[in-house]
């Protein structure tokens, strides 16, 4: 990323102050043969072709010293960087050829001498003149400019010290540390832009381990495009804040592991063969390598926009429950923007004084639902009166409370605005929500997450923005007579070890209807799923998707019907399912980047057979888990395993559901 200290905003302003660059315009192959950007038409956008001089903006570097203005090149749009890397710099090169291709690109567009730049590091800024360029090394040969201009955080950094430093570096500096001084003639526009692309690439795209990756297909498709998209998704607030933190932590861990791995490999090359120390180092090296591969796989899942939604991330909720009030009293909170006498009379009759003794119950009035939720203790009730309420924070519900609408859901609308995280965060032991319409805007996380405890949603409407409802491990979720739509990810995500009961709901117009996370790992419990009389329709992908690792696909093909595990898992249903589609990780990645389309499965009686298909696939997956556990116990010397331990009931029932007009069918499997 271009240094924010020089711009005051860095690339964070990219979406707000776009700058067009010369090579964003598509060039014909013939023009490339003449030399990239060597003629006026190829180095400036059509909006600048009739204007003399530079087509770029300039800005003054911050600091105590008055430096000359430099080119402002860090506010480029996604497609401008995309086209530059794809068409002109990297093309179809392999990871091992990146520096070579970059050097060839720079030879075509970079002025070899005659320009000035600000050499910028974390410690100082100094003005230099470029006398030559070592393209192969991506370095410039420089000398101090006259007059001498330097801005340093260290007062003792004198001109003599700077000369000594340059001598140590043989007057050769990395191009990415140079910021070209502005020249309104336009002669150095290409130079400034080319250096910006090199700088951005090595700061945001390149990883130190990339060269050691397999070169089966071009580096741009495999690494550059997904990382570039993720960078701009983060800039434009399309990625949850927690996931961004996870990504940067994974990067740091991977870099640290790779550094240790390189040091270990270097020490091994200097060891005597067959020594005890070498054997120990080799074991440690294998461990580091395995650790790195796992970290890199996690990074790839986050970098890919489709898999980012499919796998998500485990957000830890640190909400603390308040418990019961010290007085032991329970309070009813009434939410209304304005309280009319007639409304108050109806409330007293219908809700507040239904039982004897409720006349003594305390009532608090609020103008917005968020303040009411925040004021709740264990056992409180929140009654939301008809109206349209706009909130900007998260409903963090850690105590067992009831949140209910007084009227029809369409008359009681709670709308969340602002680029925050989750709309409703549930960690309470027994939370009940009913009769409310939740509307989400500009979100980067799901509309409702059940982290733990039990949450019941009844007679509600959920208008989603990103993912819909997420049911985490060990959580219980019950949804009845509700409508969920609009999720860009899955409408409902079900994690291993959770319980999910869905009855008489509509789930539609989402990316996927319901997504069941991988539960085949030995550390995971089988989820308990009940789906009765739901209508799952008009989703872009599948009605229901099961995510599981590729390594278990062979087991499924060889699984035998009628095993004890199958018998324990059977429910009241019949019918033979079609074979579920399987999509491996690479196909998913290609699909997400638009390189291929997943094949749609034809199922003429989809809404009838969909229930059977889901049941049979889940039974087969659960059977695999039982077989794997038996094998592991056998390896430990336990020859007679208790079948009851391995035949947990996955679901109470999957019956009466209708699957209509889902883009890829009623059921699919993601293999990763």
UniProtKB/Swiss-Prot annotation:
InterPro entries: Beta_helix (IPR039448), PbH1 (IPR006626), Pectin_lyas_fold (IPR012334), Pectin_lyase_fold/virulence (IPR011050), SHCBP1-like (IPR045140). Keywords: Acetylation, Cytoplasm, Cytoskeleton, Phosphoprotein, Repeat. GO terms for biological process: fibroblast growth factor receptor signaling pathway; regulation of neural precursor cell proliferation. It is found in: Midbody; Cytoplasm, Cytoskeleton, Spindle. Gene3D superfamilies: Single-stranded right-handed beta-helix, Pectin lyase-like (2.160.20.10). SUPFAM superfamilies: Pectin lyase-like. The modification Phosphoserine is found at residues 5, 31, 42, 44, 47, 273, 634. The modification N-acetylalanine is found at residue 2. GO terms for molecular function: SH2 domain binding. The modification Phosphothreonine is found at residue 7. SMART domains: PbH1. It holds the Pfam family SHCBP_N. May play a role in signaling pathways governing cellular proliferation, cell growth and differentiation. May be a component of a novel signaling pathway downstream of Shc. Acts as a positive regulator of FGF signaling in neural progenitor cells. This is SHC SH2 domain-binding protein 1. The lineage of its organism: Eukaryota, Metazoa, Chordata, Craniata, Vertebrata.
């Amino acid at each position: 990323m271009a240094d924010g200290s020089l711009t005051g905003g860095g690339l964070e302003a990219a979406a707000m102050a776009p700058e067009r660059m010369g090579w964003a315009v598509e060039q014909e192959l013939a023009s490339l043969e003449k030399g990239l950007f060597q003629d006026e038409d190829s180095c400036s956008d059509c909006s600048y072709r009739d204007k003399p001089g530079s087509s770029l903006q300039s800005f003054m570097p911050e600091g105590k010293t008055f430096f000359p203005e430099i080119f402002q090149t860090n506010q480029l749009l996604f497609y401008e960087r995309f086209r530059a890397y794809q068409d002109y710099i990297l093309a179809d090169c392999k990871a091992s050829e990146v520096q070579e291709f970059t050097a060839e690109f720079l030879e075509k567009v970079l002025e070899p001498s005659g320009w000035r730049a600000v050499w910028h590091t974390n410690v100082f800024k100094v003005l230099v003149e470029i006398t030559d360029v070592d393209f192969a090394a991506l370095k410039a040969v420089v000398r101090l400019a006259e007059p001498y201009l330097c801005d340093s955080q260290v007062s003792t950094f004198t001109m003599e010290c700077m000369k000594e430093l340059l001598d140590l570096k043989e007057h050769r500096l990395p191009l990415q540390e140079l910021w070209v001084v502005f020249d309104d003639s336009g002669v150095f526009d290409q130079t400034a832009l080319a250096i910006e692309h090199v700088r951005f690439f090595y700061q945001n795209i390149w990883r130190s381990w990339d060269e050691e990756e397999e070169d089966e297909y071009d580096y741009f498709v495999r690494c550059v495009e997904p990382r570039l998209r993720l960078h701009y998704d983060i800039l434009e607030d399309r990625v949850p804040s927690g996931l961004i933190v996870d990504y940067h932590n994974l990067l740091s861990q991977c870099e640290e592991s790779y550094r240790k791995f390189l040091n270990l490999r270097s020490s091994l090359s200097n060891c005597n063969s067959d020594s005890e120390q070498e054997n120990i180092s080799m074991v440690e090296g294998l461990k580091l390598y395995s650790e790195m591969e796992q970290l890199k796989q996690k990074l790839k899942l986050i970098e890919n926009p489709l898999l980012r939604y499919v796998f998500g991330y485990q957000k830890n909720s640190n909400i603390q429950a308040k418990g019961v009030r010290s007085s032991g009293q329970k309070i009813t909170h009434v939410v209304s923007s304005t309280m009319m006498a007639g409304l108050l009379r109806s409330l007293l009759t219908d809700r507040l004084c239904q039982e004897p003794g409720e006349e003594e119950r305390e009532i608090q009035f609020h103008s917005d639902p968020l303040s009411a939720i925040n004021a709740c203790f264990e056992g409180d009730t929140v009654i939301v009166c008809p109206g349209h309420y706009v909130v900007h924070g998260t409903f963090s519900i850690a105590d067992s409370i009831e949140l209910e609408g007084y009227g029809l859901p369409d008359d009681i609308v709670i709308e969340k605005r602002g680029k925050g995280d989750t709309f409703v965060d549930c960690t309470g032991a027994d939370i009940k929500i009913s009769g409310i319409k939740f509307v989400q805007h500009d979100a980067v996380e799901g509309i409702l997450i059940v982290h733990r405890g039990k949450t019941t949603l009844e007679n509600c409407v959920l208008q989603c923005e990103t993912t819909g409802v997420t049911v985490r491990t060990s959580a219980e979720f019950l949804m009845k007579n509700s409508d969920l739509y609009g999720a860009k990810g899955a409408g409902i995500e079900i994690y291993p070890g959770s319980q999910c009961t869905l009855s008489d709901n509509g789930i539609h117009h989402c990316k996927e209807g319901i997504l069941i996370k991988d539960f085949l790992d030995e550390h995971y419990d089988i989820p308990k799923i009940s789906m009765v009389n739901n209508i799952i329709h008009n989703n872009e992908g599948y009605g229901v998707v099961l995510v599981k690792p590729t390594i278990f696909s062979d087991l499924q093909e060889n699984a035998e019907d009628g095993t004890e595990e199958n018998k324990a898992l059977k429910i009241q249903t019949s019918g033979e399912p079609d074979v579920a589609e399987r999509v491996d990780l690479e196909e998913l990645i290609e699909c997400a980047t638009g390189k291929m389309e997943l094949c749609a499965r034809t199922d003429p009686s989809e809404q009838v057979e969909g229930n059977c298909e889901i049941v049979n696939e889940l039974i087969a997956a659960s059977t695999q888990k039982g077989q794997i556990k038996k094998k592991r116990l056998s390896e430990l010397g336990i020859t007679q395993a208790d079948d009851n331990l391995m035949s947990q009931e996955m679901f109470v029932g999957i019956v009466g559901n209708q699957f209509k007009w889902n883009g890829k069918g009623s059921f699919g499997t993601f293999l990763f």
